[in-house]
Amino acid sequence: MFLPWLYLFVAGFLEVCWAVGLKYTDGFSKWMPSLFTGTALLISMLLLAKAAQSLPIGTAYAVWVGIGALGTAIMGILLFQEPISLFRLIFLILLFLSIFGLKYTA
């Protein structure tokens, strides 16, 4: 049962890559960032589908979205100087705990 979770976590990481990549595509007018973003999106979806063959779809999708949301929020703070507040930090921590809670209860 290790491999489906590995697929899922890599898919979540790639979701962060394509979401952040959208900032660099300039509406998909820049070909290199657009190619990177599209490739990350495609591989992320394929790995999510592969993980969902063995994991409950509700759990797989929730974990995938959670990793993407958490990672994208963190990258927004680190790369794009997006604001961080105490409440945002608390909810990001709760999201992190929720991802692992879903993994351990699946």
Per-range role (PLM):
Residues M1-A106:
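Polytopic alpha-helical membrane proteins, predominantly small-molecule transporters/carriers
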